């Protein structure tokens, strides 16, 4: 099952610094890369303006999505907050098998 997930930056996010210069970036990047490697995060990236991030996630339930994303160090310190998790029926998929 797929979910469209919106995450918002905030809390201790330092808007004067680049993404890769934020506190705890290396740990966050390792965590997110592992979710991609597992096939949990299919696609993801910031939306226009940079405050929100959109992820396409493959998971069994909304609870699974929220539980897994809550393990991120940036979620734990308030830099990222899950704003919405919506079931998504994918009808078009151009990714190669």
Where does each model-flagged region fall?
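Conserved, structured core segments of small domains
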Residues: 1-97
